[in-house]
Amino acid sequence: MSITKDQIIEAVASMSVMEVVELIEAMEEKFGVSAAVAVAAGPAAEAVEEKTEFDVVLTAAGANKVAVIKAVRAATGLGLKEAKDLVEAAPANLKEAISKDEAETLKKQLEEAGASVEIK
């Protein structure tokens, strides 16, 4: 006489937790398997999106503030007073959402003038 799946399920449902643990251990031994939860292969990891827009942040004017103000004016097109206020308000965003090449060029120009600059 053959036992059906429903009968097995009913038998397991009527067992205590300790009996179920013992049953699992016996099945692991008998069939040479592990009852550890198998991790299902999820969707492939999404490609990390490369950042395309960068912000250039003036963190400090440095010792040569006049040269930094000139560099800020040249880079941003601001007037003398606005550029001076921006440099004195450091840390301050100089340009936002620009390309990586443009950000690197601006950073290099400002650092040559004596400023401390970050690209975010």
From Swiss-Prot:
Q: Which Gene Ontology molecular function entries are recorded, alphabetically?
A: mRNA binding; structural constituent of ribosome
UniProt-listed InterPro entries: Ribosomal_bL12, Ribosomal_bL12_C, Ribosomal_bL12_C/ClpS-like, Ribosomal_bL12_oligo, Ribosomal_bL12_oligo_N_sf
Which Pfam families does the protein's record reference? Ribosomal_L12, Ribosomal_L12_N
Q: Which GO terms describe its biological process?
A: translation
Entry GO CC: cytosolic large ribosomal subunit
Q: Which UniProt keywords apply?
A: Ribonucleoprotein, Ribosomal protein
Which family is this protein grouped under? Belongs to the bacterial ribosomal protein bL12 family.
Please explain the role this protein plays, according to its UniProt record: Forms part of the ribosomal stalk which helps the ribosome interact with GTP-bound translation factors. Is thus essential for accurate translation.
Subunit field text: Homodimer. Part of the ribosomal stalk of the 50S ribosomal subunit. Forms a multimeric L10(L12)X complex, where L10 forms an elongated spine to which 2 to 4 L12 dimers bind in a sequential fashion. Binds GTP-bound translation factors.
HAMAP family, sorted: Ribosomal_bL12
Q: Enumerate the PANTHER family for this protein.
A: 39S RIBOSOMAL PROTEIN L12 (PTHR45987), LARGE RIBOSOMAL SUBUNIT PROTEIN BL12M (PTHR45987:SF4)
Indicate what this protein is called per its UniProt record. Large ribosomal subunit protein bL12
Q: What is the lineage of its organism?
A: Bacteria, Pseudomonadati, Pseudomonadota, Gammaproteobacteria, Aeromonadales
Q: Which gene encodes it?
A: rplL
